[in-house]
Amino acid sequence: MKVRPSVKPICEKCKIIRRKGRIMVICENPKHKQAQG
């Protein structure tokens, strides 16, 4: 999980979702998991 000021999808399987007011990227690849804030 990376926490970044700006989150971007890395591959075509990355999905952007909102969870508890945070923008997150979830993906099949665990290295692509990101959270904003």
Swiss-Prot record:
GO cellular component, one term: cytoplasm
Pfam family, one: Ribosomal_L36
InterPro entries associated with the record: Ribosomal_bL36, Ribosomal_bL36_sp
Keywords: Ribonucleoprotein, Ribosomal protein
Any one Gene Ontology molecular-function term assigned to this protein's record: structural constituent of ribosome
Family designation: Belongs to the bacterial ribosomal protein bL36 family.
Protein's name in the database: Large ribosomal subunit protein bL36
Biological classification of the source: Bacteria, Bacillati, Bacillota, Clostridia, Eubacteriales
Gene label: rpmJ
